[in-house]
């Protein structure tokens, strides 16, 4: 399943596309995927996930969340309602924020090289201040799976 953000920004849309692509690449149907839309904050995702659980909506056995905040909020809601993570439902996040290391169970996540991204963005800004570029620049960076205990 996918815990997608209720905010419609490019990063989250790209993660949704990546989720669907991975589902198809593993021979599964995206039509059968369980997708829940949650607020992209711990508190918002917690509240939204409680509503989903309490409504009786079917839950997936595993979820990829658009960010770690959503994953952490969902884990807290699942645990409050008696689910065991990862035994009943596994969850992986994206961003590798520090809160993911201290939640129980520690969150499996995708790490992004934030320092490199910041340095690259600053260098690009300086270049554009010196010589304006009439088009946007998109730079893709590699990510790393950080295996912890939520999967």
What are the functions of these language-model segments?
Residues 1-151:
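Bacterial carbohydrate/catabolite-sensing allosteric modules
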């Amino acid at each position: 399943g996918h815990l997608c953000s209720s905010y419609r920004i490019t990063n989250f849309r790209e993660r949704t596309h990546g989720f669907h692509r991975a589902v198809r690449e593993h021979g599964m149907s995206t039509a059968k995927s369980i997708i829940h839309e949650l607020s992209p904050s711990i508190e918002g995702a917690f509240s939204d996930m409680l509503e989903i659980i309490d409504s009786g909506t079917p839950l997936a056995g595993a979820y990829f969340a658009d960010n770690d905040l959503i994953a952490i909020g969902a884990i807290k809601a699942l645990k409050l309602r008696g689910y065991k993570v990862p035994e009943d439902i596994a969850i992986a996040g994206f961003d590798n924020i520090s809160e993911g290391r201290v939640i129980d169970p520690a969150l499996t996540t995708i790490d992004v090289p934030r320092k490199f991204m910041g340095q690259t963005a600053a260098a690009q800004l300086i270049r554009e201040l010196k010589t304006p570029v009439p088009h946007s620049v998109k730079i893709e960076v590699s990510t790393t799976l950080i295996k912890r205990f939520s999967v």
